Amino acid sequence: MKPLIIAGRGIRLAKEQKRFRQFIERCQVPFVSTWGGADLTPTDHPLNTGILGMCGQIGANKAVQECANLIAVGTHLAIPHTTTLTDKFAPNAKIMCVNIDQDQLANMNVKVTPWCKGVSEWLDSALFFHAERSWIERCLELKKMNEVGRPKVAYGVNSYVFNDIMTRMLPAGTCMVIDGGGTALYTGFQSSHIKEGSRLICSTGMSAMGSGLPEAVGACFASGILTTCLIGDGSFMLNIQELQTIKHHNLPIKIFVINNDGYLAIRDTQKGFLGGRHTGVGGDKDKSISFTPILRQSLAYGIDFVRITSMNSIEEVIGSVLDRDGPCICEVICPGDQEMRWRQGFIEENGKFIPQTLDNMKEAA
């Protein structure tokens, strides 16, 4: 058998993280997660194949395309997870979707066998089964494809390398907030190393730019634990007033600002689909907008500031950030032309862009 489970946020909403983990370990069934289910287990869990979807990891997406039986639990398989090519999603699999909301099951874009049950009820009645050892080993091979590596950069720091190192240095039980802006979103979901008891928070329903700072404030107040926020320089300015909230309450939030000279994700879209005609995105080729230096913003609010400018200084600077008791802003200088590590591929044919399935994601050069 080649079964695969898609673990969604509904599992946590049902407070069934522990029983879900016991189930997959007893059955020895590999799983991938949605964005909202990414922190159900540590990244290192041997059955965790990664995060699926358009901003997800290539190994997880390949596992979905290769499996024979797919069980989606606590998710409704939204387009960010399946893309618009719903007829080519998990083409070799029989798909079952476990969801407590009948209306969502009735409006699925993917053809599934619906099971309108809560996660707890499903776990009570689920049959135990085992995956073939060869399939488990195949998923472990696919998981290796998720690794970031150490790509070369002309200057500054590759955001994926930075985030990989940073999240590995964080203690277990950290609350990690990812902003909804493109660069932070792709970087966060494709390179975060989640440890036991850590949380990964993001506005997954909206993927809203600028959501990171207010989410970090709320998460820190609610959890009372070390909180980090990964955010781009463009998104950083959208809710900058929250810096005063952070300063006023001396919240232990470590803000890592990816400075890629403006709106990199939009710039990348303009490059790929609009012939490189850049406007409203900042950077060397577009002077229509500008950004206040992050150092000046941190000084205005009286928050500690550090900067990472090279690959060699990543660990040292992150260490100094984590050693501080209160809030800190860490500016991470990244190339303005850095490509997304993995993204949905498109082929241009006769002036049209033809989308590709997620097992053929485009890899950064």
Identify the role of each PLM range.
Residues 2-14, 24:
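Glycine-rich phosphate/diphosphate-binding loops and the adjacent beta-loop-alpha structural elements
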Residues 10, 36-40, 75-78, 101-102, ...:
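Acidic, glycine-rich active-site loops and adjacent beta-strand->loop/helix elements
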Residues 14-36, 174:
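Redox- and metal-dependent alpha/beta enzyme cores, enriched for Fe-S-associated oxidoreductases
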Residues 19-27, 82-102, 197, 342-358:
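A short, gly/pro- and small-residue-rich
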Residues 37-138, 255, 318:
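Glycine-rich, acidic loop regions that bind phosphate or pyrophosphate groups
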Residues 66, 106, 114, 120, ...:
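Thiamine diphosphate
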Residues 140-223:
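Active-site diphosphate/adenylate-binding microenvironment
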